[in-house]
Amino acid sequence: MEVNKLNSLVELFFEKLNKIDKEKPFLKWLKPNKSTYTWRQVSERIFKLSNKIKSIIKEGDRCLILSENRPYWLMTDIAIMNAGGISVPIFTTYSSNDYKYILNDCKPTIIIVSNNDQFKKIKNFLNPETKEIISFEEIDHKSLLIDKNF
């Protein structure tokens, strides 16, 4: 594999995927239970999420990721790029004003959060451009009651 002939991280991932034993470990998460993800598992999750994203966005649309560092973060980033979106990663430690500014500035078509705690940080700053909110973990339905005073 000649890395200098590849144009993106997505190409690099799929080039490697086509050449490697898909049952080999790709990611290992030390928390909470030292989970290991094989190349097959990771690629299946990337394809599934990428297809979902493609069904919602146009090429070049922004997709915001608000998550702690975890395996799904990497899978999400690759899925967004594979779908033709632009990843907008934001830290979980920003202030409310930071979240408000970023959401207003980037106007993401999709927001992907890791869990209910992260969703609560941004729910009051959603805008009409956001068509879908995806979460790695289940979100409390009460959290979805959003006051959209635009």
What is each PLM-predicted segment?
Residues 1-61, 78:
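N-lobe entry segment of adenylate-forming
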Residues 31, 35, 120-150:
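ANL superfamily adenylate-forming
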Residues 35-36, 52-94:
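Conserved AMP-binding/adenylate-forming
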Residues 41, 101-105, 110, 137-150:
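Nucleotide 5′-phosphate-binding alpha/beta core
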Residues 61, 109, 131:
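Conserved acidic residues
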Residues 67, 90-91, 114, 131-141:
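Short beta-strand elements of ligand-binding domains
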Residues 92-125:
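Conserved ATP-dependent adenylate/AMP-binding module captured primarily in the ANL superfamily
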